[in-house]
């Protein structure tokens, strides 16, 4: 039986009475954002709106984006990435679970030196897919051209964010490439792997 979104007690500063809010709303107030599902237009717009609002609220305080996503639609994912580059606050990206496809693209899009993967996280990159196989011949040609442009964009961004040569990214994206947290660090998708300490919880490790 589904339990729905957990709710917690929260009181706004200056309010005499506490109220119940869903846990994500509470965490948003601490500038903690979550990408925890497949990427589509609705989720993309929600994250973009939150980043813009929190940026306007305090442009000097960092944002934290936790990524556990199998990927999703390319254009909504690029929209999230572009917003991350546009807003004034630095955005930390933290991978837990899986960051695949556009999820890894967004993970790599965090501020350099502020991208982290949990020790058992998995990262996957591959080329963008399309539904052109259902299209008519003319539509197939147009969509194939568009997908080639999108792939070129993703390849260029991955190269910029990871430091890998463009030809390496291009070849690796031809198939599904899965990486452990340490492999993603070596590849340049993240900067650190979080290491669990008995006394101090998780901390980033070079």
From Swiss-Prot:
Pfam families, sorted: CLP_protease
Keywords, sorted A to Z: Chloroplast, Hydrolase, Plastid, Protease, Serine protease
Top EC class, one word: hydrolase
EC numbers, comma separated: 3.4.21.92
Catalytic activity field: Hydrolysis of proteins to small peptides in the presence of ATP and magnesium. alpha-casein is the usual test substrate. In the absence of ATP, only oligopeptides shorter than five residues are hydrolyzed (such as succinyl-Leu-Tyr-|-NHMec, and Leu-Tyr-Leu-|-Tyr-Trp, in which cleavage of the -Tyr-|-Leu- and -Tyr-|-Trp bonds also occurs)
Subcellular location: Plastid, Chloroplast stroma
Major location (coarse): plastid
GO biological process entries: protein quality control for misfolded or incompletely synthesized proteins
Record-level GO cellular component terms: chloroplast stroma; endopeptidase Clp complex
A GO term for molecular function: serine-type endopeptidase activity
Active site positions, chain numbering: 101, 126
Function of the molecule: Cleaves peptides in various proteins in a process that requires ATP hydrolysis. Has a chymotrypsin-like activity. Plays a major role in the degradation of misfolded proteins.
Subunit structure: Component of the chloroplastic Clp protease core complex.
Family to which the UniProt record says this protein belongs: Belongs to the peptidase S14 family.
The protein, known as: ATP-dependent Clp protease proteolytic subunit
UniProt organism field: Solanum lycopersicum (Tomato)
């Amino acid at each position: 039986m589904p339990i729905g979104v957990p709710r917690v007690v929260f009181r706004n500063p200056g309010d005499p009475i506490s109220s119940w809010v869903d846990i994500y709303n509470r965490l948003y107030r601490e500038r903690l954002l979550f990408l925890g599902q497949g990427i589509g237009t609705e989720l993309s717009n929600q994250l973009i709106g939150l980043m813009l609002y929190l940026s306007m609220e305090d442009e000097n305080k960092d944002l934290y984006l936790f990524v556990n996503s199998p990927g999703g639609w390319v254009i909504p994912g690029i929209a999230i990435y572009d917003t991350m580059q546009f807003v004034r606050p630095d955005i930390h990206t933290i991978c837990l679970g899986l960051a695949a496809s556009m999820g890894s693209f967004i993970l790599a899009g965090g501020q350099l030196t502020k991208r982290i993967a949990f020790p058992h996280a998995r990262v996957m990159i591959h080329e963008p897919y399309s539904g052109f196989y259902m299209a008519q011949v003319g539509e197939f040609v147009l969509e194939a051209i568009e997908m080639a442009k999108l792939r070129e964009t993703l390849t260029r961004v991955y190269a910029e964010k990871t430091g890998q040569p463009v030809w390496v990214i291009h070849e690796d994206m031809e198939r599904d490439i899965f990486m452990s947290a340490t492999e993603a660090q070596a590849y340049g998708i993240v900067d650190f792997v979080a290491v669990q300490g008995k006394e101090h919880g998780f901390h980033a490790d070079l």
